[in-house]
Design a protein with these regions (language model features):
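Structure-specific nucleic-acid interaction/processing domains
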Residues: 2-118
């Protein structure tokens, strides 16, 4: 039987021991692997100015730890992102750049918004 990688879905948060700033994310990887991915971006993508990476560079990556919020087995990336979005909206983390991860507008609404110059 085929197992989707999304059966290993999880919602996590990055916290630091300097202040109350947090980041919420989702992954299908082990948390230690996901944390290494963030640390790689901090070191190797210096032009990436997302809030999380700017904060990690400013106060030091050694001050950040990753914590599991919820194991969330699901069937698709969309399901996982919707769950992540739920937690972002609940706790309002300060280091997330985006709060809307899934665009739920219909194609008609998207076309209207593009025509009117909205994002």
């Amino acid at each position: 039987e085929y197992m989707s990688k999304y059966e290993h879905g999880k919602i996590y948060k990055l916290v630091n021991d300097i202040n109350t700033d947090t980041y919420i994310g989702s992954t299908t990887q082990p948390l230690s692997v996901r944390l290494q991915g963030h640390l790689h971006y901090v070191k190797h993508r210096l032009s990436d100015e997302r809030r999380l990476y700017t904060a990690m560079r400013a106060i030091g990556e050694q001050h950040f730890t990753i914590e599991l919020i919820e194991e969330y087995p699901c069937s698709s990336r969309k399901d996982l992102l919707l769950r992540e979005e739920y937690y972002i909206n609940q706790s309002k983390p300060t280091l997330n750049t985006f709060t809307k991860l899934i665009d739920t507008r219909t194609s008609q609404e998207l076309n209207r918004d593009r025509y009117l110059g909205r994002k």
